[in-house]
């Protein structure tokens, strides 16, 4: 199931997801020692283009693909980027076209072996596939009770749907696709939310979208429930607090 295929999911995704990507691109630029823009970069599973737009800082020609036409309808409002609908494992581009391929918070939905073979086909010699994640662990600054609420209340009510989180990024899996994992980097992103902003973010998660799509809940009902539950963590409607996201980056090089 494509949890991000509906118009409702796309609009909420674009509004609610935090803009952390520029920070990650800074890490990528430093590791690759980029002192000039790359010619071409491709962002796969680009969603509404938040991660794709960030690539404009390091590439002259930027492309984005996603399986969801509704996501791309939102993304296409941004000039200077070429978007098209395509599954991660079958991209509509010629061999050896890109200096960089990125995936932000999407690889766990792929057939990863097929995707790696496709990424190898798309990349120029020695170019990088960079996969990164900005995961929400339920960590709120100076408020340990929020982590308990996230685990014992929120995720029990809305459990995460199945995804591919167990892939082994080992030489045994990567070498047949002519890839090598050259580095894994981990750090935290601090994001400030007020209650409405945190609610808007949480309803973009697949564990919320899944029960909406199956008609067990409505977005309106979940929003009301979240705002009631979250009120205890915010002094008023305008108070903003820091939440920490776990960011990791995998740098895979074509060999």
Task: Describe every region a protein language model picked out.
Residues 1-36:
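Conserved class I S-adenosyl-L-methionine
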Residues 89-100:
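A short acidic, Gly/Pro-enriched loop at the edge of an enzyme's catalytic core
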Residues 55, 118-119:
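Class I S-adenosylmethionine-dependent transferase superfamily signal
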Residues 105-106:
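Short catalytic micro-motifs in class I SAM-dependent methyltransferases
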Residues 168-255:
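Conserved Class I S-adenosyl-L-methionine
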Residues 120, 125-194:
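Conserved catalytic/acceptor-binding region of the Class I
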Residues 40-44, 48-90:
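Class I SAM-dependent methyltransferase SAM/SAH-binding core
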Residues 110-118:
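A short, conserved alpha-helix within the catalytic core of class I
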């Amino acid at each position: 199931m494509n949890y991000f295929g509906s118009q409702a999911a796309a609009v909420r995704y674009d509004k609610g997801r935090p803009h952390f990507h520029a920070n990650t691109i800074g890490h990528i630029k430093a590791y690759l020692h980029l002192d000039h823009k790359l010619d071409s970069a491709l962002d796969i599973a680009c969603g509404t283009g938040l991660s794709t737009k960030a690539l404009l800082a390091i590439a002259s020609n930027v492309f984005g693909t996603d399986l969801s036409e509704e996501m791309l309808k939102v993304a296409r409002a941004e000039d200077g980027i070429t978007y098209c609908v395509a599954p991660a494992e079958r991209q509509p581009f010629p061999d050896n076209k890109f200096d960089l391929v990125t995936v932000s918070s999407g690889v766990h939905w792929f057939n990863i072996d097929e995707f790696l073979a496709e990424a190898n086909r798309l990349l120029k010699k020695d170019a990088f596939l960079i996969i990164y994640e900005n995961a929400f662990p339920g960590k709120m600054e100076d408020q340990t009770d929020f982590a308990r609420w996230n685990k014992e209340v929120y995720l029990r009510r809305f459990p995460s749907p199945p995804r591919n989180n167990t892939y082994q990024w080992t030489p045994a899996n990567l070498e047949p696709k002519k890839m090598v994992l050259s580095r894994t980097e981990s750090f935290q992103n601090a994001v400030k939310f007020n209650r409405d902003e945190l609610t808007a973010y949480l309803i973009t998660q697949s564990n919320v979208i899944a029960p909406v799509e199956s008609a067990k809940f409505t977005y309106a009902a979940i929003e009301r429930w979240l705002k009631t539950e979250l009120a205890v963590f915010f002094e008023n409607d305008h108070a903003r607090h820091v939440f920490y996201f776990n960011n990791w980056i995998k740098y895979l090089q074509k060999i």
